[in-house]
Swiss-Prot record:
Organism lineage: Viruses, Varidnaviria, Bamfordvirae, Nucleocytoviricota, Pokkesviricetes
Protein name in UniProt: Protein OPG005
Cited Pfam families: Poxv_Bcl-2-like (PF06227)
Length: 181
């Protein structure tokens, strides 16, 4: 189940927009202060030490996809963890080629998952390289080009949740902890 909500409040005469998303019970909240046009989720400047559980990795990936899909994201201000996740785009190009992101039927989650599984050797035990490529593909597809904003990021989040299993999150957590970034 997905729910989106936006809470607007006025503490100390400064307007803040706090969009939040809940996917299958996992909630993410973001802050964006006006007139500052910057979108910062809580894991944006996280380090590998701030991810301790599978739930932390799920939460981080949810926030990350929302962050890269937001048109006011300042990617140059990303923390080291997000820069690592952004770097996975090259893994996606190596595994899937350069044209898959535009060819996937993002509005049909099941078909997307099946197409991506065709590139994976063992779906129940994906390698770190395959996981990086999947996240990189989602990153490439979620990044807003120009000023166009759409809801494709929700489909990307759903596909990511459907294709990744518990073992994948553990493999990804281990990779993040051992990566040099």
């Amino acid at each position: 189940m997905i729910s989106l909500s936006f809470l607007i409040h006025n503490p100390l005469k400064k307007w803040k927009l706090k969009p939040s998303i809940s996917i299958n019970g996992y909630r993410s909240t973001f802050t964006m202060a006006f007139p500052c046009a910057q979108f910062r989720p809580c894991h944006c400047h996280a380090t590998k030490d701030s991810l301790n559980t599978v739930a932390d990795v799920r939460h981080c990936l949810t926030e990350y996809i929302l962050w890269v899909s937001h048109r006011w994201t300042h990617r140059e201000s990303a923390g080291s963890l997000y820069r690592l996740l952004i770097s996975f785009r090259t893994d996606a190009t190596e595994l899937f080629g350069g044209e898959l992101k535009d060819s996937l039927p993002w509005d049909n989650i099941d078909n997307c998952v099946e197409i991506i599984k065709c590139f994976i050797r063992n779906d129940s035990m994906k390698t770190a390289e395959e996981l990086r490529a999947i996240i990189g593909l989602c990153t490439q597809s979620a990044i807003v080009s120009g000023r166009v904003f759409n809801d494709k990021y929700i489909d990307i989040l759903l596909m990511l949740r459907k294709i990744l299993n518990e073992n994948d999150y553990l493999t990804l957590l281990d990779h993040i902890r051992t990566a040099k970034y």
